[in-house]
Amino acid sequence: MGNNELLEVCNENGVGLGRPATRETVHKEGLWHRAVIVALVNKNNEILIQKRSKEKEKFPGLWDLSIAGHVPFGHDSLSCAASETMEEIGYMLPKEIQLKEFRFMTSFRSQLPISDTFLENQFYDFFVFNSDIPIESFHVQDGEVEEVRYVTAFEIKTMAEKGLFHPRTEWINVLYNYITKF
């Protein structure tokens, strides 16, 4: 979605105020808003990650979870998680599993000052989606993603420690604990 996408402004506790603002406005003014992150986990407990294009304005060339996005005004996080799965990796989920297979893990608050004119103040809802989608089934967007791969939770922790991962990493320990239980 573009900078005109409408998002719901939240207070500093993550409560929606019922007031829409454009994506450009919330980032320019540092207004709080909601977003989702989804970890796609296969039967081997490997997580799908993507390498952001070097052309990206924010965090070029860094690895990140493959599914993330803003929650549009008037939508909920769960339906957003399902639609972002299609948008981000080009995989249409069968209707019967679209929502029931997403496991809510936690919410967290994240502040990332990107530049003088771009403040990312977001409340993330973090979901896990268990599915054995083969890597060749994904259709990534040119100019957005350089590569996708499945890795272990330990590999993600190591990559983050080396500075190879997107700096928004509050979800890593939650995912690591979830996966290592099995």
Describe the predicted segments one by one.
Residues 24, 61, 67, 73, ...:
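Nudix hydrolase/Nudix homology domain
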Residues 33, 97-99, 122:
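Short gly/pro-enriched beta-turn/loop segments at secondary-structure junctions
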Residues 35-69:
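A glycine-rich, hydrophobic loop/mini-helix early in the fold
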Residues 2-37, 41-43:
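Acidic, metal-coordinating catalytic segment for phosphate/diphosphate chemistry
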Residues 48-49, 66-103:
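The catalytic Nudix box helix
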Residues 7, 30, 46-47, 137, ...:
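A residue-level structural signature of the nucleotidyltransferase/glycosyltransferase Rossmann-like core
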